[in-house]
Amino acid sequence: FCSAGIMLPNGASGCPLHNLIPEWNDMVYRGQWQEAYERLSLTNPFPEFTGRVCPAPCEGSCTVGLIGEPVTISSIEYEIIEHAFQNGWVKPAKAPATGKRVAVVGSGPAGLATAHYLTSVGHAVTVFERSDRPGGLLMYGIPNMKLDKDIIQRRLDILEEAGVTFICNTEIGKDIAAQDSDDTYDTDVLCGGATHARGINVEGNDAKGVHMAMEFMTANTQNIL
């Protein structure tokens, strides 16, 4: 795989984000940690999340695995972003103001990524979240043993420093009329998550003690925070 040459068939299909994995792997090998972080950031705004919770399909696609154990790509990604934080390379994404105002509905992974990229080109971004704190699935759907809440807050602080405004306990269409949002902002970006469980059509699925995972995780996390 070489991003500057001819792509081999399925050469980058192992990563849904199309991370430039061979490139930053090589940079880490050469001790070029800051360059590796900059390369990783081209395709992934939040490596500290994916480095901890991504199921790493890239490792399943790693050709080294044909002759032995695959490269531990997820661990390398984790080390790159933590090196970046420790050395002060992770900075708020700022740009000259465009005068455009954007409302982002939902503060899960999609909403946060949208806020990051829009702020990085100079738009004023307000993120609306119906829960009591931002983060969505990251905050309420993933336990601390996989993704500590301090890691999420660290990124939220950076986004706020970049100029992103978070408004929680607010549901568009209920607490604020959708028309009011349209009148106040130049555009709206809908980033709502899939919060309603589908359930399973089996006998006993409604028995006492059977809980949908997201409902259980959300309630459990709210009790802890």
PLM features: residue spans?
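Residues forming the flavin
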Residues: E77-L225
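Ferredoxin-type iron-sulfur electron-transfer modules and their immediate structural context
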Residues: F1-R101, K149, L190-N220, L225
